[in-house]
């Protein structure tokens, strides 16, 4: 699995076990990603932070 890093077009191949790509954004500024990368379990979104997870190459 390949996931985008914070600044596309840079990306990395995920290590074994981390089979989701994720993008973290602030709810106040949903178009500006704060963090991107590989993750094993999708974190829960909160009142301030939203997580978007997916499992195909560079989908974040």
From Swiss-Prot:
Compartment list: Secreted; Target cell membrane
Keywords per UniProt: Cardiotoxin, Cytolysis, Disulfide bond, Hemolysis, Membrane, Secreted, Target cell membrane, Target membrane, Toxin
Recorded family membership: Belongs to the three-finger toxin family. Short-chain subfamily. Type IA cytotoxin sub-subfamily.
Any one Gene Ontology cellular component term annotated for this protein: membrane
Subunit structure: Monomer in solution; Homodimer and oligomer in the presence of negatively charged lipids forming a pore with a size ranging between 20 and 30 angstroms.
GO biological process terms on file: killing of cells of another organism
More about this protein: Positive charges of Lys residues are necessary for cytolytic activity of this toxin, but not for its binding ability.
Tissue specificity remark: Expressed by the venom gland.
Superkingdom assignment: Eukaryota
Lineage, top ranks: Eukaryota, Metazoa, Chordata, Craniata, Vertebrata
Residues in coiled coil: none
SUPFAM superfamilies, per database record: Snake toxin-like
Disulphide bonds in the chain: 3-21, 14-38, 42-53, 54-59
Protein name, UniProt field: Cytotoxin 1
CDD domains in the cross-refs: TFP_snake_toxin
The protein's role, per its UniProt record: Basic protein that binds to cell membrane and depolarizes cardiomyocytes. This cytotoxin also possesses lytic activity on many other cells, including red blood cells. Interaction with sulfatides in the cell membrane induces pore formation and cell internalization and is responsible for cytotoxicity in cardiomyocytes. It targets the mitochondrial membrane and induces mitochondrial swelling and fragmentation. Inhibits protein kinases C. It binds to the integrin alpha-V/beta-3 with a moderate affinity.
Record-level Gene Ontology MF annotations: toxin activity
Cited Gene3D superfamilies: CD59
Record bears the keyword Metal-binding: no
Pfam family membership, one: Toxin_cobra-type
